[in-house]
Amino acid sequence: MPFLGQDWRSPGQSWVKTADGWKRFLDEKSGSFVSDLSSYCNKEVYNKENLFNSLNYDVAAKKRKKDMLNSKTKTQYFHQEKWIYVHKGSTKERHGYCTLGEAFNRLDFSTAILDSRRFNYVVRLLELIAKSQLTSLSGIAQKNFMNILEKVVLKVLEDQQNIRLIRELLQTLYTSLCTLVQRVGKSVLVGNINMWVYRMETILHWQQQLNNIQITRPAFKGLTFTDLPLCLQLNIMQRLSDGRDLVSLGQVAPDLHVLSEDRLLWKKLCQYHFSERQIRKRLILSDKGQLDWKKMYFKLVRCYPRKEQYGDTLQLCRHCHILSWKGTDHPCTANNPESCSVSLSPQDFINLFKF
């Protein structure tokens, strides 16, 4: 590759691409890579062989880069930082804007599912994306979505916890894909239609695995939940935020069934999730003329969204507009960064990228 210097009469320089990159060929007097430039230029066969080797190296490098982003790899798209700057418009300093797919790739969701405090948050976020935001993700973000979902399913199969939660997530995703895949030719999903059909078959396989799961009893024989005092059992049951969990717990033993029908337990559950105004609009009386809080709860759930509470959430710094997990350090110039942080619910996270 000739290069003309400042003097147009100079012969210029000769470069060749090697495994270590582009190198310049000089003569013997400069003690360089090749002894004689003129002798090198006369070796036409050597030039052809070197060009062939450089092309092979270039193709191999591109292939390795492509394999890293291939859908067959199960590793999440990796970014060194655990935070992302959220900008919604172009400025002189920054061009473009941050998208939902970019934030989904760069925030550490793959590791977050291993944390019990963040697990429910990530699952809820996956559910919201599956409902309405799947088409707004880029191709690599969609592959990342499926890879994280696979890790969630494998974790549930191993831990045998949150089975119903993941069943609902898979059913929501499958229903959305059925609607999107039917729109053939409208390019609503990134990638070949056959690839998405294969992913739908994978979802059905995961659902079958969850349906066939058998809960194994612990090997040790020690103190169980039913061995605790009744007041302590009731206190623990009051920590459950889902009425379906109370119903399932009541099916374990007759004594637990009596506790699960406690009116005060269901009253506190209704007051936790819903406002007084919402409760007054859905009053249900029992045969004895008393409020049936259990029936009221399930009716309220069908009419209003339940209160969401998570052990750990994503937070947005109002000073520097950086999005990160709570407790993650980010470069902030505020005097008190903690006072500038606002916790985001999964829906708030989705709304943050609606332009």
From Swiss-Prot:
Entry's localization field: Cytoplasm; Nucleus
Location of the F-box domain: 223-271
Short motif Bipartite nuclear localization signal, span: 280-295
Keywords annotated in UniProt: Cytoplasm, Nucleus, Ubl conjugation pathway
Record-annotated membrane-spanning stretches: none
UniProt short sequence motif Nuclear export signal, positions renumbered to this chain: 169-173
Gene3D superfamilies assigned: 1.20.1280.50
Biological processes per GO annotation: cellular response to dexamethasone stimulus; protein ubiquitination; response to denervation involved in regulation of muscle adaptation
The protein's annotated pathway: Protein modification; protein ubiquitination
Locus of motif Nuclear localization signal: 62-67
Gene Ontology CC, one term: SCF ubiquitin ligase complex
Function: Substrate recognition component of a SCF (SKP1-CUL1-F-box protein) E3 ubiquitin-protein ligase complex which mediates the ubiquitination and subsequent proteasomal degradation of target proteins. Probably recognizes and binds to phosphorylated target proteins during skeletal muscle atrophy. Recognizes TERF1.
Subunit composition and interactions: Part of the SCF (SKP1-CUL1-F-box) E3 ubiquitin-protein ligase complex SCF(FBXO32) formed of CUL1, SKP1, RBX1 and FBXO32.
Protein name: F-box only protein 32
Organism listed in the record: Sus scrofa
Gene: FBXO32
